[in-house]
Amino acid sequence: MIHVLAVITTKPGLRSQVLEAFHANMPAVHAEKGCVEYAPAIDTPGMGKFQTPIGPDGFMVIEKWATKEDLMAHAAAPHMAAYGAKVKDMLANRVIHVLSGA
């Protein structure tokens, strides 16, 4: 199992627009071979010092893929290129962690 945690930071005030595009792309991703989980998440309010907030312009993408090859095919998929082109000017930063079980 391959795990991906991607921290996405949008330009100020654009998170909802990026999430709208993300949600529109989700059905195509969920239909991909090997996709176990693919979903965005935002900060849970009221957690205090227990958490390190992503912030109002950020969200995390939580992914699970059956194999590394499935993840690589996902990254090269035409719908991902289209999503990337749609949101690229709205993003300030992205950090992607690709992990394996320990």
Segments the model singles out, each with a brief description of its role:
Residues I2-T9, A39-A75:
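Short, well-ordered beta-strand segments in beta-rich or mixed alpha/beta enzyme
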Residues M1-I2, A102:
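Absolute protein N-terminus
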